[in-house]
From Swiss-Prot:
One of its GO terms (cellular component) is cytoplasm. The gene is aat. It holds the Pfam family Leu_Phe_trans. Its EC number is 2.3.2.6. NCBIfam families: aat (TIGR00667). This is Leucyl/phenylalanyl-tRNA--protein transferase. Keywords: Acyltransferase, Cytoplasm, Transferase. The keyword Iron does not apply.
């Protein structure tokens, strides 16, 4: 008999999640309810292919949808027209220099079909805590001193779990995603988790993986050692125009 109710989590952040395969079919991927956003619980969730997603006024909801939406780090779609525009782009790229601003901008960005934001104050505080602990990271796009795009997520081992991205100017989020993918591909990280499919992600080259395949991939990648050094030091400051010549498809 298939499960019809999500698992209720205990108040202990060290308590395990149920297997992701126990997630409901309707709504797709809902696995558990309750608990908290303690860093130990969050890291345990991501390491097992689970993520939190809820709105203000809802209890904490934990998901592992099937299929899972991912980006191959060598397969971000940048159109020929966009690449031509990139060649003369004067924007610069950095990592982990404006994490708080990126997550705040993502929270304020309107989403088609969504009223309000799921990046609540509670969520922002939780990911700022993960950032301070060295697990949550951002790639940022600047026009001079102005932040015009960015993406943030969680890295465990050699797996990046994307959370959200934003554009403060046309193309900002696309450049941030391409910059992240190019960096991770260079490090040998094959996938970026994109969680749930939407038309925008699919136009950028996102693909679907069956949950079983995704979980196997996550188990392998999170067990690998992350490269030494901070993201800011490794990344430095780069020119967005360099992405025009990077073959990601």
């Amino acid at each position: 008999m298939s499960r019809t109710l999500p698992h209720l989590l205990s108040s202990d952040p060290a308590s395990p999640f149920p297997p992701a395969e126990h997630a409901l079919r309707e709504p797709d991927g809902l696995l558990a309810i309750g608990g908290d956003l303690h860093p130990q619980r969050l890291l345990n969730a991501y390491a097992h292919g689970i993520f939190p997603w809820f709105s203000d006024g809802q209890p904490l909801l934990w998901w592992s949808p099937n299929p899972r939406t991912v980006f191959r780090t060598d397969a971000i779609h940048l159109s020929s027209r966009f690449r031509r525009q990139l060649r003369t782009c004067t924007w610069t790229l950095r990592a982990d220099t404006a994490f708080a601003q990126v997550i705040a901008a993502c929270a304020l960005s309107p989403r088609p079909g969504q009223d309000g934001t799921w990046i609540t104050d509670q969520m922002q505080e939780a990911y700022l805590d993960l950032h301070r602990r060295g697990y949550a990271h951002s790639v940022e796009v600047f026009d001079g001193a102005r932040l015009v795009g960015g993406i943030y997520g969680v890295a465990i081992g050699q797996m990046f779990f994307g959370e959200s991205m934003f554009s403060g100017a046309s193309g900002g989020s696309k450049i941030a995603l391409a910059a992240l993918a190019a960096e991770l591909h260079g490090l040998g990280w094959p996938l970026i988790d994109a969680q749930v499919e939407n038309p925008h992600l699919m136009r950028l080259g996102a693909q679907r993986l069956q949950r079983e395949q995704f979980l196997q991939h996550v188990a392998t990648q999170v067990a690998l050692p992350e490269p030494p050094g901070s993201w800011t030091q490794r990344y430095g400051e780069r020119h967005a125009s360099a992405l025009a010549g990077v073959r990601l498809t």
